[in-house]
UniProtKB/Swiss-Prot annotation:
Residues 19-26 are annotated as: G1. Signal peptide: none annotated. Its EC number is 3.6.5.3. One of its GO terms (molecular function) is translation elongation factor activity. Residues 138-141 are annotated as: G4. The lineage of its organism: Bacteria, Pseudomonadati, Myxococcota, Polyangia, Polyangiales. It is an enzyme of class 3 (hydrolase). It catalyses: GTP + H2O = GDP + phosphate + H(+). Monomer. Residues 10-206 form the tr-type G domain. GTP binds at residues 19-26, 83-87, 138-141. Keywords: Cytoplasm, Elongation factor, GTP-binding, Hydrolase, Magnesium, Metal-binding, Nucleotide-binding, Protein biosynthesis. It comes from Sorangium cellulosum (strain So ce56) (Polyangium cellulosum (strain So ce56)). This is Elongation factor Tu.
Length: 396
């Protein structure tokens, strides 16, 4: 059978369900698909298939995360939706960014209100730079007293405000995913309300191609009579012959001009996000540039050595450490294309970190690297990955 062609008629947005165990995240995911499949805006998938999930790998290909991916459309958009079966999978997914989210659907059972994992997921969403949360108050079919629902809604809004989300204006939809999944029209309508809240509240993401140019350097070689070529995959933006770039990381930042762009040995007018290219750089000696530096649009990113990160420490079964580590631990930090040694400082009152924990830590690198908030990194020791993290704040 021929593969279905993906036709891009509507803007694409990535979302996911977050919230406490048994509050109905997977049932809601199934209901979204089911309700939209009746309108020919999704392919129906059973609850069991979503719960079974698939697996995703993070960019460093070390952390395996159980996650189900479904897709559906609203009137205006195409959504890809991720739902994780286990609490640990949510934490790993949010920290590694393996399944990206532009916004989240926070599912809260109106019978239980805010629970520990509700808080933890909202805090993590804040740490990893998710700015838009739409709330679905679930199981409203089991609550007779509307004042009870007002109370739960108030608690959820307070929680959002506490973690610097817009608790006053975030949409809160009161619904019930199980009867909606079973075809009850009254509750199916709440799924439509949720979709229109997603459409109006989560802004359309800026496409990678529209962001300022950045390419992490993977390899460098010189071409006799032409100069030095840096190769790598363009992370974002566009590069054309004649563009000025900065070479950032490890040493003093240097400026150059791109005099040629090639892909698979063919000359291009321009390279764009996702392309693997070689950039010919004017006036740069091969010795002045190395793997792990980046080429970037001047002024768009700066080198740093000190930052805080939210880190997930791999368990022994995931190939991580067997023992805890302490403040002043000195592993390698794999950032974009290279390892840089750094020193870990744990928060006050935290004596040690066990495999399987997630923790906020301060990291100081021995050499400056092009860094920005929400960037992912891996922690390695002797060539194996022992942690995965995201930059939450740049300090120096």
């Amino acid at each position: 059978m021929a593969k279905e062609k993906f036709t891009r008629t509507k803007p694409h947005v990535n979302v996911g369900t977050i919230g406490h165990i048994d509050h109905g995240k997977t049932t809601l995911t199934a209901a979204l698909v089911k309700v939209q499949s009746k309108r020919n805006l999704a392919k129906a998938i059973s609850y069991a298939d979503i719960a079974k999930g698939g697996t995703v790998r993070d960019e460093t290909k070390t952390v395996t995360i159980a996650a189900a991916h479904v897709e559906y459309e609203s009137a205006n958009r195409h959504y890809a939706h991720v739902d994780c079966p286990g609490h640990a999978d949510y934490i790993k997914n949010m920290i590694t960014g393996a399944a990206q989210m532009d916004g989240a659907i926070l599912v809260v059972s109106s019978l239980d209100s805010v629970m520990p994992q509700t808080r933890e997921h909202v805090l993590l969403a804040r740490q990893v730079g998710l700015n838009h949360i739409v709330v679905f108050l679930n199981k409203c079919d089991a609550v007779d007293d509307p004042e009870m629902l007002d109370l739960v809604e108030m608690e959820v809004r307070e929680l959002l405000s506490k973690y610097k989300f817009d608790g006053d204006n975030a949409p809160v939809v009161r619904g019930a995913s199980l009867p909606a999944l079973q075809g009850d029209p009254k509750w199916e309508e709440t799924i439509q309300q949720l979709l229109s809240a997603l459409d109006s509240y989560i802004p359309e993401p800026v496409r990678d191609i529209d962001k300022p140019f950045l390419m992490a350097i993977e390899d460098v070689f010189s071409i006799k009579g032409r100069g030095t070529v840096a190769t790598g995959r363009i992370e974002r933006g566009v590069i054309k012959v004649g563009d000025e770039v900065q070479i950032i990381g490890f040493k003093d930042t240097k400026k150059s001009v791109v005099t040629g762009v090639e892909m698979f040995r063919k000359l291009l007018d321009q390279g764009q996000a996702g392309d693997n290219v070689g950039c010919l750089l004017r006036g740069v000696e091969k010795e002045e540039i190395e793997r792990g530096q980046v080429l970037a649009k001047p002024g768009s990113i700066t080198p740093h050595t000190k930052f805080t990160g939210e880190v997930y420490v791999l368990k022994k079964e995931e190939g991580g450490r067997h023992t805890p580590f302490f403040t002043n631990y000195r592993p390698q930090f794999y950032i974009r294309t290279t390892d840089v040694t750094g020193t870990v400082n744990l928060p006050e009152g935290v004596k040690m970190v066990m495999p399987g924990d997630n923790i906020t830590m301060t990291i100081e690198l021995i050499a400056p690297v092009a860094l920005e908030e929400q960037m992912r990194f891996a922690i390695r020791e002797g060539g194996k990955t022992v942690g995965a993290g995201v930059v939450t704040k740049i300090l120096a």
